[in-house]
Amino acid sequence: MGGNQESFDCINHLNNVFVNTIRGLGGNNRYRHLMITTNGAGTSEAILSNLDIINDDYVIVSVHAYTPYDFAHDKTTITSWSVNNLSQTKSIDDVFNRLNNHFISKGIPVIMGEFASRDKNNLSSRLAWLEYYLDKAVSLGIPCVWWDTGQFKSDENMTFSIFNRNTLEWLFPEIVEMLVSKTK
């Protein structure tokens, strides 16, 4: 899982063109923080190993990680998550260990540009998962952005939302509270 050399070369080229274009505009653009991404915004070893790091003090690497996938993203019947389930915690640990090894430990900032867990009528498991996930991210200084699709119960394919944009109400205030309290 992770792409091929052609896709790695393409994203590296686009990242370089992007950074060089913004920097070439002059003024304060040389100090502007810019986010580059990995192939598919992925976090596998193959993907992270093939990202060309741009020598620029204001570049941030943006990735996405819905992990463990069968709990967080897939529409499977996997609805429970527990800190005592080593395969589930290992999935999260592995992602953050790779991000630390490739970037954080080298002074390269990372942002988790997308993460979330699908609503499967499993709020207590989602909260346990979120607490563990955020603890790992915060320990490395990685800010996380919850992927709110704007869709909820009416669309089973993308039930990651925590805010109802029609009624302007929080669907899962407990998730919002944890997002805020863990990242202060």
Question: Where are the regions a protein language model picked out?
Answer:
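Active-site region of glycoside hydrolase catalytic domains
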Residues: 1-86, 97-117, 139-140
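Soluble or luminal CAZymes and related metallo-dependent hydrolases
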Residues: 10-17, 87-98, 125-129, 167, ...
